[in-house]
Amino acid sequence: WSSDVCSSDLNLRAPSVIGIDTHVGGVMGVDAYYGRRAEILESWKKDIRELAKCQNVVVKLGGIGMCSFGFGFHDRDYPPTSEEVAEAWRIYVEPCIEAFGVDRCMFESNFPPDKQTCGYTECWNAFKIIAKNATATEKKALFSGTAARVYKLIAP
């Protein structure tokens, strides 16, 4: 993640090319960013809203299990539950969905890197928990439809 949103200029100049923002923008929560989540989150939300103005950009909702996000689950003696993961990740997933809409968002597992935080099952269950109030159409977009369209795949 970068506060200058430099990629948006490129996306505006090449509107026929689909830009993919991975890992919700790769927000850092360690090293120099540790303990500054609230400050960084507000700046990141502003940048996400700006990037979402580029109609050719989609965002992958995942990769949040990497240690660089700074949730600290990897430091515990026991793994987090799906509910704990959902609660932690929600602060990044929901603003992306609000800014981009479900037709420009797709859940991603990012395994094995996300394995640093939680298991594969907990990851996908966390996404289901986050999306529990979405309509069936919205869930289809988030879990398969957007990815199928962007990557030109045949969705079930």
Predicted feature residues:
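Short, small-residue-biased leader/transition segments that mark boundaries at the very start
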Residues: 1-7
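Generic detector of well-ordered alpha-helical packing
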Residues: 5, 24, 109-111
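Short, catalytically relevant binding-site loops at active-site mouths
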Residues: 6, 25-29, 65-68
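N-terminal cationic-hydrophobic initiation segments that often serve targeting/anchoring roles
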Residues: 9-13, 52, 97-98, 131
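Non-cysteine beta-strand/loop elements that form the S-adenosyl-L-methionine
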Residues: 19-25, 57-61
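Beta/alpha (TIM)-barrel catalytic core signal, keyed to glycine-rich beta->alpha loops juxtaposed to Asp/Glu
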Residues: 21-39
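Active-site-adjacent C-terminal substructures of enzyme catalytic domains
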Residues: 35-117
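Mid-to-C-terminal alpha-helical segments outside catalytic/metal-binding sites
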Residues: 91-95, 99-106, 113-156
